[in-house]
């Protein structure tokens, strides 16, 4: 490889995998007799870490809880992770890649895993809406800036 090619910005997906998965159905089997529609709550968390020179792991954790007024139907948590090769990217551009681009890649995998696991537990599949990770990232940055000025 020429020196110029080695200095070109590079981004590639090395591996996508499920790092952790859990499902709890604390009120089975009675919960399967319920007729009411549950309230679905979804929480997201994303974290990135450098593994090696130019290699980063990003983990997107999706937690979905289905609740009835007085009991939990299920709690499903999926930690979908990926190893990404990111080279020759300026420092100020690295954070948005780890906080926006990588979660955008991981979310469809996490969404499918949640739906499949919930369905295998005997519930209708949960269809999670797409997430605007750029808007979430900008919101977090604004909150951090506000907290820094307080």
UniProtKB/Swiss-Prot annotation:
Disulfide bonds: none annotated. The gene is secB. It comes from the Bacteria. One of the proteins required for the normal export of preproteins out of the cell cytoplasm. It is a molecular chaperone that binds to a subset of precursor proteins, maintaining them in a translocation-competent state. It also specifically binds to its receptor SecA. One of its GO terms (molecular function) is unfolded protein binding. This is Protein-export protein SecB. HAMAP family: SecB. It holds the Pfam family SecB. Homotetramer, a dimer of dimers. One homotetramer interacts with 1 SecA dimer. Belongs to the SecB family. The lineage of its organism: Bacteria, Pseudomonadati, Pseudomonadota, Betaproteobacteria, Neisseriales. Gene3D superfamilies: SecB-like. Its main location: cytoplasm. Keywords: Chaperone, Cytoplasm, Protein transport, Translocation, Transport. One of its GO terms (biological process) is protein transport. One of its GO terms (cellular component) is cytoplasm.
